[in-house]
């Protein structure tokens, strides 16, 4: 038996050993797949890239607002519970898939080709998000350049873009010591700068007539794409070095903003508003749903970024440890960002003489209107404004690197012989194509299109993708087999906590989110603008398209097989004959592609019923693996 074990470990994994003679010629395998694919130059590259990917703009402009509107400090209870039930397990699952296979979001579905449509849906979603996400980075660049002046351009009224409604709110009273007659009808200089100068939204007649291209935004968008391209030019080799700055420097700026914020008069008022617990909110299902949504989107599960980054790891990288570092670090960063934001909002509310809830907003309104207005009230306002927008720039770029690397990796893994030698050129073509598709976002009505993309591109479709991935891995491939793969990779099997979450808790939570998003569906809007019916239909179709790619992929997989429908489904759900670790030295145990006493090699099949799946196939290799394990135990006694 020892000779048999040595033969298994010594035997090279070649295409001849992975298929029957009848199969040869039908399958083209890249045996040295990982040799020329590349890896991170260091373990810290991967960790910082994951932190940069997860810690993004949403941590600054979404989490604080969600927290204070859903019970303040009490919101942290469902937030951390959902992190444990949904966030950490799904994060670890996606990292495990990528690292074990060294494959991108498309090729990883060798694990079960029937579900390859889920990988295609990931690419569609991440592609749409990347188009509008870089437009947000372009807005940040615009404000960053505007901060390089002695006086911020949104500090005063009297500019050509201002209207008679513009009012410089310097306190609860006007210059004559009397309250304005109709404070609600006035507009701050920062709001008019954003809507009338940056967006020039008054030049649009709606989403159907977006107006002319704003060339200043067009150039900022071009610069954003040039920066992204240069940083991903050499794949993870280059982006992995850039994140040493872009993933760490935001924390320095956040710390500076936090220290400055808490020293302002009225800061404690804002912090109290942010964190004062209101436990009666926990009785509302909406609060729990909001917590789950925040976890789901902030960790970036389902976009393929985590899977892609992990695919460049060495086979034994400790992603279990990395999972907890990144997920808990992301949560702590969100909480700290809330302190930095609400301390300044508290100061702002005291200066204006209005309640905190009248100055608190979420999303672009916070980043491009409220916070810039607060900056004008500080000494050295251009300096603090520059720091704030530089922080947003680095936060946004990290996520954008992941989006583009996901697309490039997925396609090059599908066509390695054609695209991998020209990966830089292919990356450039992707950036050019997305820049051209994003030009509509630089028009007068571009914000309408951005809102539509933001509302629908990664909504219910993303939840369906993650549910499908979770069920395909745990129910079809098999939870026991998946845990065995992780044991081969990390040296231990996931415990009951992870198994229970993967099998029941995480899919159930995601299903609840999906049902909630459908039941509570509300049409898109931007300010007072209501989107026309055709735009709503377009958005819904956008979300449905990613969902439909899953059954479409199933249909293609089934049509490629032979036999009855049930036989086709069985065959399509089997792992591909070359599924497993990409490097020969890591293909041990059940992945050693020879069978004891066999004259001719056979494909490596998976005993799915024994390992938790729904199909059953012969696999003598598992019996050999069991015998080897038993002999090892006897030798240790």
UniProtKB/Swiss-Prot annotation:
Molecular function GO labels: L-proline transmembrane transporter activity; proline:sodium symporter activity
Coiled coil: none
GO cellular component: glutamatergic synapse; plasma membrane; presynaptic membrane; Schaffer collateral - CA1 synapse; synapse; synaptic vesicle membrane
Single biological process term from Gene Ontology: proline transport
InterPro entries: Na/ntran_symport, SNS_sf
Presence of keyword Membrane: yes
Stretches assigned to the Cytoplasmic side: 1-45, 557-637
Modified residues (Phosphoserine): 22, 573, 582, 598, 600
Residues bearing carbohydrate: 182
Subcellular location: Synaptic cell membrane
Transmembrane spans: 46-66, 74-93, 117-137, 215-233, 242-259, 295-312, 324-345, 378-397, 425-443, 459-479, 500-519, 538-556
Function: Brain specific sodium (and chloride)-dependent proline transporter. Terminates the action of proline by its high affinity sodium-dependent reuptake into presynaptic terminals.
Family label: Belongs to the sodium:neurotransmitter symporter (SNF) (TC 2.A.22) family. SLC6A7 subfamily.
PANTHER family assigned: SODIUM-DEPENDENT PROLINE TRANSPORTER (PTHR11616:SF231), SODIUM/CHLORIDE DEPENDENT TRANSPORTER (PTHR11616)
Protein name as annotated: Sodium-dependent proline transporter
Species for this entry: Rattus norvegicus (Rat)
């Amino acid at each position: 038996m020892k000779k048999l074990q040595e033969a298994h470990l010594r035997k090279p994994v070649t295409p001849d050993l992975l298929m029957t003679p009848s199969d040869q010629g039908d399958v083209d395998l890249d045996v040295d797949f990982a040799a020329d694919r590349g890896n991170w130059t260091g373990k810290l590259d991967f960790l910082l890239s994951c932190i940069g990917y997860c810690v993004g703009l949403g941590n600054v402009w979404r989490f604080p607002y969600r927290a204070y509107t859903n019970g303040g400090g009490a919101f942290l209870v469902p937030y951390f519970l959902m992190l444990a039930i949904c966030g950490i397990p799904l994060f670890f699952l996606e990292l495990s898939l990528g690292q074990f296979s060294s494959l991108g979001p498309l090729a990883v579905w060798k694990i079960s080709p029937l579900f390859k449509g889920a990988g295609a849906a990931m690419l569609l979603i991440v592609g749409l998000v990347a188009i509008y996400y870089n437009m947000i980075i372009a807005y940040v660049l615009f404000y960053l350049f505007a901060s390089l002046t002695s006086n911020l351009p949104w500090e005063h009224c009297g500019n050509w873009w201002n209207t008679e409604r513009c009012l410089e709110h310097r306190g609860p009273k006007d210059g004559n010591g009397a309250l304005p007659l109709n404070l609600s009808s006035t507009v701050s200089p920062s709001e008019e700068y954003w809507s009338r100068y940056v967006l020039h939204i008054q030049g649009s007649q709606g989403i159907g007539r977006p107006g002319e291209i704003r060339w200043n935004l067009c150039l900022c968008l071009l610069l954003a794409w040039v920066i992204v391209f240069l940083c991903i030019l050499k794949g993870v080799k280059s982006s992995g070095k850039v994140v040493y700055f872009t993933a760490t420097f935001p924390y320095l700026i956040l710390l500076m903003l936090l220290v400055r914020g808490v020293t302002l008069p009225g800061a404690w008022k804002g912090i109290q508003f942010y964190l004062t617990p209101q436990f009666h909110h926990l009785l509302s299902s909406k609060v729990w749903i909001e917590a789950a949504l925040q976890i789901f989107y902030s960790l970036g599960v389902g976009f393929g970024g985590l899977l892609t980054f992990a695919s460049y790891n060495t086979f034994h990288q400790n992603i279990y440890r990395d999972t907890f570092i990144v997920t808990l670090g992301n949560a702590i960063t969100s909480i700290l960002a809330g302190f930095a934001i609400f301390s300044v909002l508290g100061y702002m509310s005291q200066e204006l003489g209005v309640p905190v809830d009248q100055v608190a907003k979420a999303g672009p309104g916070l980043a491009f209107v409220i916070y810039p207005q607060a900056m004008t009230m500080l000494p050295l306002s251009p300096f603090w404004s520059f720091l704030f927008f530089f922080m947003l720039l680095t936060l946004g770029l990290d996520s954008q690197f992941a989006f583009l690397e996901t697309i490039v990796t997925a396609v090059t893994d599908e066509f390695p012989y054609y695209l991998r030698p020209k990966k830089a050129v292919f990356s450039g073509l992707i950036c050019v194509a997305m820049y051209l598709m994003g030009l509509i976002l630089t028009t007068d009505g571009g914000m309408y299109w951005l809102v539509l993309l933001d509302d629908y591109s990664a909504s219910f479709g993303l939840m369906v993708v993650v549910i499908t991935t979770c069920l395909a891995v745990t129910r079809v491939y098999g939870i026991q087999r998946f845990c065995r793969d992780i044991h081969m990779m990390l040296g231990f099997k996931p415990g009951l906590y992870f198994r229970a979450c993967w099998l029941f808790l995480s899919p159930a939570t995601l299903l609840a989110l999906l049902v909630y998003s459908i039941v509570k569906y509300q049409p898109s809007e931007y300010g007072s603008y209501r989107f026309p019916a055709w735009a709503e239909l377009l958005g819904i179709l956008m979300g449905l398209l990613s969902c439909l790619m899953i059954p479409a992929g199933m249909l293609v997989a089934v049509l490629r097989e032979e036999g009855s429908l049930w036989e086709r489904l069985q065959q399509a759900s089997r792992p591909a004959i070359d599924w497993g670790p990409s490097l020969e030295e890591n293909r041990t145990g059940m992945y050693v592609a020879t069978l004891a006493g066999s004259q001719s090699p056979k494909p490596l099949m998976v005993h799915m019923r024994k390992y938790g799946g729904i199909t059953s196939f012969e696999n003598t290799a598992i019996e050999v693996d069991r015998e080897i394990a038993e002999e090892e135990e006897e030798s240790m006694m």
